Amino acid sequence: MSELYKNIVLCQNGDKKAIEYIINRFEILINKYKMSFLKEIHFNSYDIEDNKQDLIVSLINIVNKIPIDNPQFENEGCLVNYIYKSILNSRKDMYINKNIKRYFIESQSLSSMVEFKDKPLVKYIESNIEIEDMLKCLTEKEQKVIKYKFLNDKSEVEIAEIMGTSRQWINRIKNTALKKLKENI
């Protein structure tokens, strides 16, 4: 049995030194991912440290949920791989939650700036902010094609005429952009 396996068993039994060992063992990974969020998501300078604390809490939860009875986990490589992938998933969840928090704060500030009677305007502005955020992962051409296609209800032939290119090229750009958007959502 590896030292990591023994410490995970001790950690699941509440041993503080084992928890400390596991945190130290994966500290490099945690430090890497605490900095991996987009700058737009950070609200202040303390967010990076908050990210680290959230990842440490996730690590402890992950370790406590490892099915240690499974003989596969006696192999240290399997344990490290399991923890690594679980931390990646936790990071993705944190990213989604921080985006939701950011949208909520932005919408609250918009709502406070616009009077109550202008609710449709607030919803229109909020949806435009969300669309612009989603399109940031695309190239300029991909953004244009998606905006023409879905926001302006243009056909691919019309977009090709506007951009001075072929319909097939527009279709290819649209499909590439949609794949990127699916991956980022």
Swiss-Prot record:
Domain of life: Bacteria
Molecular function GO labels: DNA-binding transcription factor activity
Matching SUPFAM superfamilies: Sigma2 domain of RNA polymerase sigma factors, Sigma3 and sigma4 domains of RNA polymerase sigma factors
Pfam families associated with the record: HTH_16, Sigma70_r4
Signal peptide (UniProt feature, chain positions): none
Keyword terms: Antibiotic, Antimicrobial, Bacteriocin, Plasmid
Gene3D superfamilies in the cross-refs: 1.20.140.160
Role played: May have a role in bacteriocin secretion or immunity.
Protein name: Bacteriocin UviA
Native species: Clostridium perfringens
Lineage: Bacteria, Bacillati, Bacillota, Clostridia, Eubacteriales
Gene: uviA
